[in-house]
Amino acid sequence: MSTSTTDTDKYDRQLRLWGEDGQSKLERSHILLLNGSATGTETLKNLVLPGIGSFTVVDNKKVTESDLGNNFFVERSSLGKPRATVVCELLRELNDRVKGFSVEECPIHLINNNISFFKDFSLVVANRLSEEALLTLSQYLTEQNIPLLITNSYGYIGYLRISTPEHQIIESKPDDPIDDLRIYNPFKQLVDMADALELDKLNTQQHSHVPYVLLLIKFLKEWRSTHNDKMPETRAEKDEFKKFFNSHSWSADEMNFVEGIQNLLKYIQPPRVPGDVQNLLKDPKTNITENSDDFWVLVAALKEFMTNNDNTLPLHGNVPDMTSETHNFIQLQKGYQEKALADLSEFSGYVDQILTKVGKSSISSDLVKKFCKNTRFLNIIRYRTISEEYNQPKTNLIKSELEQADTVMVFYILLRGIDKFYKTYHKYPGSSDDFESDIPLLKTVITQYLAEINISNDLVKDDYIAEFVRFGGSELHNIASLMGGVTSQEIIKLITHQYTPLNNTFIFNGINSTAGSYNL
């Protein structure tokens, strides 16, 4: 994507997070929201501002007094008007580059009578839908490979569930990755640069500015020559090497030697392929056919690259800041970049071979390059379907969590009970004037549900049930706003394929500000 000057100015801060490629994916996305509730509109707000391409709101309800109390995207003058139209108009005002559409129709009616309506969206956000509707919708979206996010706020409780068949992550962007400097097994350019060092011929300024990477490579090679070609492994050996390394320093304040000692333990470990990447390489989907998607073609090419490179991943090529004179750093940086380009060229060759073999069209060079630079951070998440969650519940996990003090898992049980209550009584518990009469009814529903999943009902206290009835099906704006932020953040991860989204359920307790995530 070639971002215009205006785009760069408008989206400057987020471009630093997910870059132009991520922004391009956002700007091509079309998000569907089912029900324009407070939680739903807060979610869209946080997607319209960073510049999704377009959104559609499907909602058959009219704006009511309760909407005025919790939804910032309706006004008093909107009372009685179609909620889909009202929230769409106000959301569009946030960003004139984003297109917004409204459909005044019942989401459940669309699901039951026109399911193909959903096939052209990038992602679907569902809010306050029945279990039956969610099962039907999620099954269809799974077949279409379209992510579904179910987000709700109920009183002080927030809930988010992600469902998508397979989410591929190329840029997981871990918080504190270790730079790939190849000190343990340096490539030829690094060895040549280290061997060329004549430290005794340098002046004090030059000696104190030799990059620590080259110092470590040089002195590790010397140390190994007197230790049967072994790297320092035991604690005693590492301490011995530190003394040997420091013995070549001309003064205690040479920062390059200080940096070498500080980074020693990180870089004298044998290179390890991350577990997530190992799992990808073993996946049956690396057996490529003409129907394989690009991600798995690239994984198969990576497998071939590693087979021919002593199980080593392609070099990223980035060099961190370090004490060095400018010309030395540029020379070092050039060595890493040349090796990274050579690895990319070899990797691209394997990609082309695989594509030719199975008769697939080419993969964009930008994607190949991005994949090759991020091979240490690859991952996939295969989500359980909503049907699996409902029909094959993880009883042991749920029971174990319920036995913990102050667990948020209890709210998962209560929310499932609320859905079942609504199915039976066509209302939310506590939404009528005589709310106390709903307490025993909700307790009965929850007791029946717990019996279905073989969990004792004494793990859900009556106080929680009464509190949920007092919520009366209400949405509170502060909880809706928080859940809108959480949901939109996960949507951006899913659309950009950057960072790692949660798997698969998030529950927030606004009463005491605790939260939990579970793979249900």
Curated annotation (Swiss-Prot):
Positions of disulphide bridges: none
InterPro entries: APP-BP1, ThiF/MoeB/HesA, ThiF_NAD_FAD-bd, Ubiquitin-activating_enz
GO cellular component annotations of the record: cytoplasm
Annotated Pfam families: ThiF
GO-annotated biological processes: asexual reproduction; chemotaxis to cAMP; chemotaxis to folate; protein neddylation; sorocarp development
UniProt-listed PANTHER family: NEDD8-ACTIVATING ENZYME E1 REGULATORY SUBUNIT, UBIQUITIN-ACTIVATING ENZYME E1
Name of the molecule in the record: NEDD8-activating enzyme E1 regulatory subunit
